Amino acid sequence: MMKYIPKKIIFGFLISLILFTKIDAQYLKRSGKDIVNDQGEKIILRAMGIGNWMLQEPYMINAVGAYSGQWEFKEKIETLIGEERTENFYENWLNNFVIKEDIDSLSSWGFNSVRLALHYNLFTLPIEEEPVNGENTWLTKGFELIDNVVSWCESNEIYVILDLHAAPGGQGRDSNISDRNPSKPNLW
C-alpha cells in the first residue's frame, strides 16, 4: 500500500500546481485577503462550476440513494446495456456535456472563470488496473477535455480552476461528491 502513496501525492501535487490557470500562463495568487493576477491587480472571480461532467455526482442529477457514486452508476448502466454501450454512453457524455458555445455563453453572461471538477480516472488507471505494479499509466482523454476547455476559455479571457474532485481512493467519506468506493483503499 505504501508504494502507491507517491502516485497519489504526485498526481495531487501536479493538479495543485495548475489550480488557477489561464492558458497564457497568467496565474492568480493570494495577496492578503485578495486574489491578484501577475500584475498585482485585484481579481474578483465570477465563476461557474462545471460539475457532473468529468465526475458524475448523484446529488446533481437527483439520484442520491439510487447510487452512491459514479462507480456504482456506471456499474448499473453496464448491467442494463453492456460494457460496449456504456463506454459509448460515456464517450458521448464527455464529448457533449460542455461545448465551446457553453463557454462563449458564460463569457457573455459576465463570468470570468470556470471550475472543472475532475475525476482521476480520465487521467490515469486505478491502482488495481495498472499493468506494471507501481507504475503510472497516463490516459489522454482527460487531458484532451481540459485542453479543449482551456482553449475555449482563452478565447473568452476566462480563468480555469482545476479541481481534482475525485482523487484515487476518494477523499473523505462522501462518495456523493468524490466517487469513493468503500471496497477499495481510501486516500483518507
What are these model-predicted stretches?
Residues M1-A25:
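Bacterial Sec-dependent N-terminal signal peptides
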Residues I15, D38, D104-L106:
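Generic marker of residues within folded, mature protein domains
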Residues A25-A47, P58:
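N-terminal module-boundary/linker segments of secreted carbohydrate-active enzymes
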Residues K42-L45, I50-W188:
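Active-site mouth of glycoside hydrolases
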